[in-house]
Amino acid sequence: MNGDYDRKFPQARALYAYMAAHPGKKLNFMGNEIAHFREWDEKREQDWNLLDFPKHREFAAYMQALNHLYLSEEALWNDYSGNGFEWVHAVSQNYPDTEHSCVFAWKRRSENGRQLLCVFQFADRADCVTLPLSEDEKPELVFDTDWTEFGGAAPKQDEVLTAQNGRAVTKMAAFSAKFFVVGKRDEAETEADEIKPEQKADTEVTADELITAEPIEKLSENSSVKLVDGAWFDRAVVYHIYPLGYCGAPQYNEGEKTQGSRILKVLDRIGHLKALGVNTIYFGPVFESLWHGYDTSDYYRTDSRLGSM
């Protein structure tokens, strides 16, 4: 693996997850399960002393959990039919052009119809990955290579992807993979996510009633509005602008000097925002820098309840 000691482990976890999810039978040499540094050698035993180090113990626990997942999910090993594999068009926020994208996704299916959505992110920084998803699908996270129990940074917790206009977004750590079991949403869940027509009857926006846009710095000047991981306060919302329309942002052209008011003109679902009671959208003044690889994810948040713009 490339990089220093700490960076090798997430890469190895992502690689073995890719191997487990890829069609075909698996072969691992002894020693791989403890992140051996040297080649397997039939003339000497493994360097079991590596398990004295936390990183290697965590990696051994990871390999054990991955093997258990492989055995328990028939879709991963019952691969005798071409119907058991389907590519999924995953889009990277950091590299929206497919030539430089480091994200991949596919579905594995078992003969009994159970589906596993496998998402991979092989770049060296966190990314926001957009996936196509039908409204009745309910992918639930069952495995994340970045969980802390494996030596990663993400606490083990539930994650359920929700479709907005046929797309869903998941945040991926650098060199990571996620596996989701794809179930079906029941009618009650679907109805709860929908906005009733009568609720938005009086919320259409006219040309003279554009939602205001302000620099995000004003958040600190307004005591009635507070940003906490994208939560809403006083009917205001922070909306993260990404290039090329991915992750639910409006589209704009590279090189264009974009102002908040001009962004608002291309929003095609203003009425949807008004129906949710949103009167103000705060835009960060970072449009041009996004084109030069500046990662603003630590400073701006997207509230997924907005839906896709």
Residue ranges, per PLM feature:
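Active-site core of glycosidic bond-cleaving carbohydrate-active enzymes
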Residues: 1
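Carbohydrate-interacting/catalytic domains
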Residues: 4-9, 13, 18-28, 32-282, ...
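Aromatic-lined substrate-binding rim segments of carbohydrate-active enzymes
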Residues: 286-309
